UniProtKB/Swiss-Prot annotation:
It comes from Thalassiosira pseudonana. Keywords: Chloroplast, Plastid, Ribonucleoprotein, Ribosomal protein, RNA-binding, rRNA-binding. Signal peptide: none annotated. One of its GO terms (cellular component) is ribosome. This is Small ribosomal subunit protein uS7c. One of its GO terms (molecular function) is rRNA binding.
Length: 156
């Protein structure tokens, strides 16, 4: 076992434009090869597109999308007696938010479109309206956990 101190979890600072911690998490998730300025421009233009399409505050829509995409339970592989079981476990709020962000970005990258900001805006709007691939992924995760409910007593 390590004798060193356990490092504290570091959180990014709030986004300067929207003063939101969630937006800064989104920017760091979109980040590729250290180009943070480009990632910030993508998020800002995506939020402008959301504002023009819905005539609502993009931050409110983004938070609603995160709430809609956050899973409550997930399955984890657990090896017991030579066989591996998919054990359903509850997801912490921090992990649920991170999974939602990861799925939104993953499915916005897979979308067919012109620019990343347009694809990201479309995925956020769809997720806020409870449609799209991100919501399908969440429901699929919940179905997997429901199907393996019999192994819930193997929880750790």
């Amino acid at each position: 076992m390590s004798r060193r101190n356990i490092s504290k979890k570091r959180f990014p600072k709030a986004d300067p434009t929207y003063n939101s911690y969630l937006v800064s998490l989104l920017v760091t998730r979109i980040l590729k090869s250290g180009k943070k300025n480009l990632a910030q421009n993508i998020v800002n233009s995506a939020f402008d597109i959301i504002k023009s399409k819905t005539n609502e505050d993009p931050l409110v829509i983004f938070e609603k999308a995160i709430r809609n995409a956050s899973p409550v339970v997930e399955v984890k592989a657990r090896r017991i007696g030579g066989s591996t079981y998919q054990v359903p476990i509850e997801v912490s709020s921090f992990r649920a938010t991170n999974l939602a962000l990861r799925w939104i970005i993953q499915y916005s990258r897979q979308r067919v479109g012109r620019t990343m900001s347009i694809k990201l805006a479309s995925e956020i709007i769809d997720t806020a309206n409870d449609i799209g691939n991100t919501i399908k992924k969440k429901e699929e995760t919940h179905k997997m956990a429901d199907a393996n409910k019999a192994f819930a007593h193997f929880r750790y």
